[in-house]
Amino acid sequence: MIEALNFKRLQEEVHDRYEYNEQCIVGIIFARYDLQHVQRIIEENYLYWNYNTKRYLDIFWAGYGEYLCPNDESATKKILKFEGNDTRIYYDLESFISVKEQFNHYLKDKDKYKDKLQLVLVNYKKGKLRFDKYISIDLEQNLDDNYKKIREIFEYITNACRNLHDVVELKERMEKDKAKRWIKGITISNVSDVINV
């Protein structure tokens, strides 16, 4: 789980984390921390997801950062409240909106962010995040008591990404496993643009 306070920083972080010729699947999660159900999901799952995904699946949190001084908390900047938040991970509403707007710039109208808890899986290839093929999951369509379905989705994707390095491979695995039967809100799209920052 990695901070993504702005799109340029996200691209730089990805570039620094991976070798130029490395290929992998990267997740970007859009989660407005000011919503009660999002707070609860993060508080109950963040540490587990962070340790469980390891290097198999890096997930960047749009609008989230680290090391906010408690005195700098405000109506738009909130330190996440979960045990083990030693780096003072925080949510920045203004940064979230900025990343969302930049993200939407690269997507067709039907695929733009629609103010819901959303996980987008993209390829990292040749030094860049690629949006020519991606998988988007509307996690809010999978809400249930204790967020069991969302936890299952993260576990499924993490396990799949141990051996898969392209969203096309993940799409094929999901089809083979008939994942659309139990995961709601999956969109698999082709977008012609590649992010160039």
Name each region found by the language model.
Residues 1-24, 149-175:
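N-terminal leader/targeting and pre-domain segments
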Residues 2-84:
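Local sequence-structure signature of Cys/Sec-based thiol-disulfide redox active-site neighborhoods
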Residues 5-10, 35-49, 89-104, 143-155:
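Well-ordered, non-membrane alpha-helical segments in soluble/globular domains
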Residues 82-88, 125, 135-169:
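Ampiphathic alpha-helical segments that act as solvent-exposed interaction surfaces
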Residues 99, 103-115:
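Thiol/disulfide oxidoreductase modules built on the thioredoxin-like
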Residues 111-133:
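A short, hydrophobic beta-strand/beta-hairpin element that forms part of a small beta-sheet core
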Residues 124-127, 143, 187, 191:
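Eukaryote-biased recognition of electropositive, low-complexity segments
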Residues 171-197:
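Membrane-inserting effector segments that mediate pore formation, membrane fusion
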